Regions:
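A conserved amphipathic terminal alpha-helix motif
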Residues: 121-158
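Hydrophobic ligand-binding cavity/cleft-lining segments
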Residues: 1-48
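Short beta-edge strand/loop motif at the mouth of beta-sheet-based domains
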Residues: 31-71, 82, 158
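Hydrophobic-ligand binding "helix-grip"
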Residues: 52, 62-112, 120-123
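Residue-level preference for beta-strand/loop junctions
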Residues: 7-9, 57, 68, 97
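Conserved strand-loop elements at the edges of beta-sheets that form or border functional pockets
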Residues: 17-19, 55, 78
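Hydrophobic pocket/interface hotspot
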Residues: 24-28, 61, 76, 87, ...
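A structural signal for short, well-ordered beta-strand segments
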Residues: 13-17, 76, 103, 117-119, ...
């Protein structure tokens, strides 16, 4: 099966954190609900009580609501601790329009890690909305990834 041709540039972000590579990977994947900003970036708004990434290939990424229901964000496609995780992403879109998010964790030193995010495959979205959605995520990942995850993991200013 052929991979989609990336005609729309991916969103890329990078943050350095004062954590070992293994710790940075673990904080991103296993502590997802501790740093994800549900109040501003969720499907359910006030109803959202947790965000979860099941730490394994095939694991679900989802939001839990106060009534116990689960609302999917995506699925873990590649699980390579502590180096890389790739997952589908279809928040607010049908699963067949999923984009893809890759996180790479590179040790800068034993106590510092560069975490790089690439959000790609916008072409899976139908109609003309892909470019607009990409721009929203370009801004959104600044808050979610750089600010929230970065602060949670001990962001190091470059």
């Amino acid at each position: 099966m052929n991979k989609p041709v990336n005609l729309i540039p991916p969103v890329t972000k990078s943050v350095r954190v004062a954590r070992s590579q293994a710790d940075a990977f673990r904080l991103y994947t296993e502590s997802y609900g501790k740093w994800w900003p549900l109040k501003t970036h969720s499907i359910g708004g006030e109803k959202a009580v947790n965000a979860v990434m099941e730490p394994r290939k095939g694991g679900r990424i989802f939001e839990e609501w106060s009534d116990g229901t689960v609302h999917p964000y995506g699925e873990v496609l590649v699980w390579e601790p502590p180096h890389r995780v790739v997952h589908s992403w279809y928040v607010g879109h049908p699963p067949h329009e999923a984009s893809e998010v890759e996180l790479r964790f590179t040790a800068v030193s034993p106590r510092e890690t560069r975490v790089e995010l690439e959000h790609r495959n916008w072409e899976t979205m139908s109609g003309d909305k892909a470019g607009e959605v990409r721009e929203r995520y370009n801004n959104g990942w600044n808050t979610v990834f750089i600010d929230k995850f970065g602060s949670f993991a001990g962001k190091v200013e470059e």
